[in-house]
Regions:
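Flexible "arm" and connector segments at domain edges
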Residues: 1-96
C-alpha cells in the first residue's frame, strides 16, 4: 500500500469509507443520467455532452479511488474475472 492510502486509512475508518463509496456511487449515477439527457436531448439540460462526459469520468475516478482503499489486489483480480464472465453472458443474451 502506498503512503497516501496508508494515511487515509489511518484517519478514516472502513465504515466511513463505505459511506463515502455510497455517496460517490450516487454521484456517478447522477452523472450517467445527466449524460443520457445531454445525448438524447429529450429532456434538455444546459450541460453539453462534453461537460457531462467529463463529469462522468470524474465521478468514476472518485468511485475507483474509494474502492482502491476498500479492496485488495486479490479482490480486484476477482472483479476482473467476474466482469469477463458477465460480459460473455451478456453477449450470449444479445445473440439470443
Amino acid at each position: 500500500m502506498d503512503r497516501p492510502d496508508e494515511k487515509i486509512k489511518q484517519h478514516i475508518p472502513q465504515d466511513e469509507l463505505l459511506a463515502q463509496l455510497a455517496e460517490e456511487c450516487a454521484e456517478l449515477s447522477q452523472a450517467a443520467l445527466k449524460l443520457r439527457r445531454a445525448l438524447t436531448g429529450i429532456n434538455p439540460t444546459p450541460v453539453t455532452v462534453e461537460e457531462a462526459r467529463k463529469n462522468l469520468v470524474e465521478e468514476t475516478a472518485d468511485v475507483y479511488n474509494v474502492l482502491g482503499l476498500l479492496l485488495d489486489a486479490v479482490e480486484n483480480a476477482e472483479i476482473y474475472d467476474i466482469i469477463r464472465r458477465k460480459k460473455a453472458r451478456w453477449v450470449k443474451r444479445l445473440e439470443g
